[in-house]
Amino acid sequence: IQGCQSRTVRDTAAFVDACRGPAPGEFMPFWSPPEPYTRLIARDPTRLKIAMSHRWGDYQSTPHIAAELDKAGRFLESLGHHVDYALPELDYREAFAAQTTCYISNFAIVISNMLAARGLTEPPEDLIEPINIRIWEHGRHTSYAERARMQAVFNTTSRGFGAFFEDWDIILTPITALPTPNHSTMATLLSP
């Protein structure tokens, strides 16, 4: 669930119940379950079709992480669910590129708005981290045409996921494909 990392199904259900649904005046329709998730999790689910993958586009989990995913899949099978390897048919490279454009351009707008509120045109190096200044520099001149292409890819990608979830109830993937870098290696992430 985007925005929530929890240790229990109960906590995740409570998070979704608290956050689901539209804000007042929302122009998009929202699906809601017939009852709160905190009540739905109190009973056993029907047999689920669970897709599983340790690959996501060009990225593949390390053997250790893939083995842990397999272990989770076997556990779910032991509970009576159908588990198999499957992925949505998507152009993952295009989707990653669109998400990167979205993140960088949205981030640049947020930083630019903060700067404008303070009468600044450039991020002060003593207040903004170097990586964030670089993201701002890269995203601040994103064109409308780039944003329109990004939205078109989002539309195609979401339709691919929609078609996938006509056949599958859940897709189970690792949160991250690689182990967390050691603290001493963080400097290399900021190197030019």
Q: Over which residues does each language-model region extend?
A:
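A non-catalytic, amphipathic alpha-helix used as a structural packing/dimerization or gating element
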Residues: D11-A14, E68-K71, F75, R149-T156, ...
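A short helix-breaking turn/cap at a secondary-structure junction
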Residues: I1-A72
